Every structure is written in C-alpha cells, then in structure tokens.
Amino acid sequence: AYYKVSLSDGRLAVISENIQSETEAEELRKLCDGTEAVVTRVKREQKKISPPKLYDLTSLQREANRFFGYTAQKTLDMLQELYEEKMVTYPRTDSQYVTEDMKETVKMLAEGMTDFLPFLGSGQIRGNIDRVVNNAKVSDHHAILPTKEAMEKGMGGLSSEKKNLLMLIGQQLVQATGEEYLYEQTEISVQCKEHEFTAKGKLPVQMGFKEVEEAFRKYCVKDKKSDEPDNKEKLPEGYEEGRTLASVKAEKSTHYTAPPK
C-alpha cells in the first residue's frame, strides 16, 4: 500500500505525491492541517484528440463487445446477415479507410445519418471526408459502412441486436468524419510546509466527435459508468499563482497497487 495526503480549502482539492510510509503521511497531514498553502504554479495547455478511424472487422468486434457484450463470433454472424440483406458493406475487411473514388458516396452516407440515427441532430454532421480516404490503406475491401439501401429501408424490420450494430457502424462514420475534440488541461501546484501538492483538470473547448459518441452512448448503451464526461474534471476558477489557501483541511488516504495480471 501507499498513501497520499490531500488538502482542500472547500473549493480546490490538491493531492500529494505517493508516500510509502504511513507514519510520514500522517506527519504531513498533521503538519498542514489548519495551516495555509500557496499556489506556486498554474500551467495551462491546449490539447486535442483526433477523431477515431472507421471500423474494420476487428475494431468493430472489439467495440460491439465493449458497448453491447457481443462476442466476436456473434458480431461476425450478424454482420454477415446484414451484408446478405444489403444493409452493410463487406464485413471481413482489415481496412479502416475508403478509396478516393468513394468520396461522394461516403459524403452522402454521412449526411444521411441525421435521418438514419435517432440520436443525431443535423448540426453534428461535419463531413470531413478526406480524413477517412487513403487508397494505400485499402487492399481488397474498404472499411465497414452502412449502405445506401440501409438508409432507404431504415431499421424498422431489424432485431434490436442488429439495430445496435448498424447504429454503431453509422455513428462511427459520423465520428470519423467529425471535428477534433479540443480541451484545455490545467495543472495547479500548491505548496504547504515545503511539500508540493497538485490538482489536474480538463475543460472541453470543442466537443467535436465526442458529442456524437456521448449521444450514442446515452441512447443505446446501458453502461453509464465507463466514460464520464470530462466536465467533471473542471477545476474551480480564480486560483492563480501567489494565491493563498487559508486554513486548509488535510486528509490522508490509503491506496493499493493492483496485483500484476
């Protein structure tokens, strides 16, 4: 086990490095409890995450398992049926891209997703098709996509499991052709009795493709716990360098290292 000491002034909570000895952690807790601490550094960085790629068979099987608990075999069987029903393109592919000559088709499919996917609004379609085009990365078959026929037929006649799979493929097309997710990462360093404590936070600046992922998750997925939205990680404002945190409350916590798998 190892220990950490956290300090809080009621708004901002900062935490120490890992401390190996419980006695040492307890001493630090006593030393800082009720005293004042000072903000020594505030570091802000702009970060970005690019949209995901389209699905090949392996990545789709992995995601169908993560979101719906389907086995790889079950996903393949359903994809095969959807392919025979002309609802999806060829499933046994190892490419996550499409070819240059498909640009117009893919653009049309992406734009049609607003009517096809019940959880999407028209403002969420960005259509950055160039992101998913790469002739060199398509050998025999391109990435898995919904078909024009699927959009014409709609999902009315499908089982709920096949619907899930088709919606997963559709939303991935919208994500992959979407905007980057931009956020500001802030790290606040605080000193108390010559010991350093830190707090890290994230503030979304542009949700980009993540907006689609969250809409899909809320609509389809019962698993609400896996990825909490980032706004929970927002730090309180007003903590600039030199600010004093008066009469902080210090607490010690115990942590356990996970055994090797």
Language-model features: where?
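Core catalytic DNA strand-manipulation module of type IA topoisomerases
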Residues: 1-261
